[in-house]
Amino acid sequence: MNISLLLVGPTDDPLLNQLIEGYVKRLNHYIKFDLQPLPALKNTKNLSPEQQSQKEGEMILRALDPSDRVILLDEKGKQMSSLGFSEFIQKQLNAGGKKLVFIVGGPYGFSPEVRKRAMSSISLSAMTFSHQMVRLFVVEQCYRAFTILKGEPYHHQ
């Protein structure tokens, strides 16, 4: 199985990009992991939040394969500990399939169609984070999950 992080829009901060790439490199020691950036929508000033979410949703759905196991990163999703997340990852790996796709949406969340396509959604925290920061947190938590699964000393309880 491969894991992808599907992103709406670029990661603007070069320091965040450097950190994200560092964790992606580490993750590839355990599993094929890649970032799948989608272009940011242009000319959104005349779009309502719902219209913007809809257009982003269409772009997201076009980027997915029918066999992809889709997990949304969403403030309304299920919260879990790092240990719980590692167990979640293990269950996904055990379920098989070619690719597990985590999706970080745009500023107005996910369209109803994207929500229907997803198997589940995860919330990283009750706090609100920028979409830029969420990218780093997800990649780090994926790395942490694999070190937990392999019994390596990165995670401390």
Language-model-detected regions and their locations in the chain:
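Short glycine-/acidic-enriched loop or helix-start segments at secondary-structure transitions
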Residues: 15-17, 81-83, 111-114, 133
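S-adenosyl-L-methionine/SAH cofactor-binding core of RNA-modifying enzymes
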Residues: 32, 39-98
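Loop/turn-to-beta-strand initiation segments
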Residues: 2, 97-102
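N-terminal beta1-alpha1 ligand-phosphate binding loop
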Residues: 1-27
